[in-house]
Amino acid sequence: VKRISFLALALLAVAQVSSAATCTSGTLASYLALGSGGCTIGNDVLSNFQTLSGQTGATEIATNAVFVTPGGGTSTPSLTFSTSQTVSTGYLVESIFTYQLSGSSITSASLALSNSSEQVDGAVTDIENFCAGGIFGPDGVDGCTGTAGSLLTLDGTQNSDASPLGPASFASITNDFTVDGGTAGSAAGGIFANSFTAMPEPASLFMAAIGILIATTARIYSKRKA
């Protein structure tokens, strides 16, 4: 009876950990719709996706025109965002949004920009601001209640950036992606990827051990019945 009670409690705990849906490919619009429940990559939860007010004069990129592809696992969660935008002289388009990452102890963040081009003084950029162990103020950039940091990419000049983060089991992330035609040029883009390095929390390791114990006990019990 004790064994059955233990297994029941363990199964309940596993069910609670896995209650959020697994992150799948979609659009920024579909990720916004996830709300506070979010989705999971391994044991990490990504949630509370929200768009923010952009630069004066910029045209917002439609959220259903930004595609999201999750990757990695518990120790290497990542999100790749892609869109196809082309602008000419005097035009600027922007996608600025924030989200939260929690679960494992996050130790570093990296940003990569690709599939972009520019002519004359056009530019494609992505700035990633992060708040380790806290949240941003209403603008998604300032007022970090934890430890703030930022990553910068400018196509053709610096296409990747990385920084230590935390360690923290919770972080707020804001991306500000722009395609700017400049005053005499043009630009097109692009793909930008947020990647993180994380260490499983003791609770995650405990749940993994519980899962192994359940499977082992079930096999032993089946053999004894046979």
Place the predicted regions along the sequence by residue:
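Single, functionally critical "micro-switch" positions that shape active/binding sites
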Residues: 200, 226
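Sec-dependent N-terminal signal peptides
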Residues: 4-13, 208-211
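A detector of low-complexity, intrinsically disordered, Ser/Thr/Gly/Pro/Ala-rich segments
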Residues: 2, 20-22, 215
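Helix-boundary and membrane-interface capping/anchor signal
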Residues: 21-198
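A short, hydrophobic C-terminal helix/tail in secreted or cell-surface proteins
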Residues: 201-219
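Positively charged n-region of N-terminal signal peptides that target proteins for export
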Residues: 1-4, 223-225
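N-terminal signal peptide c-region/cleavage motif recognized by signal peptidases
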Residues: 15-17
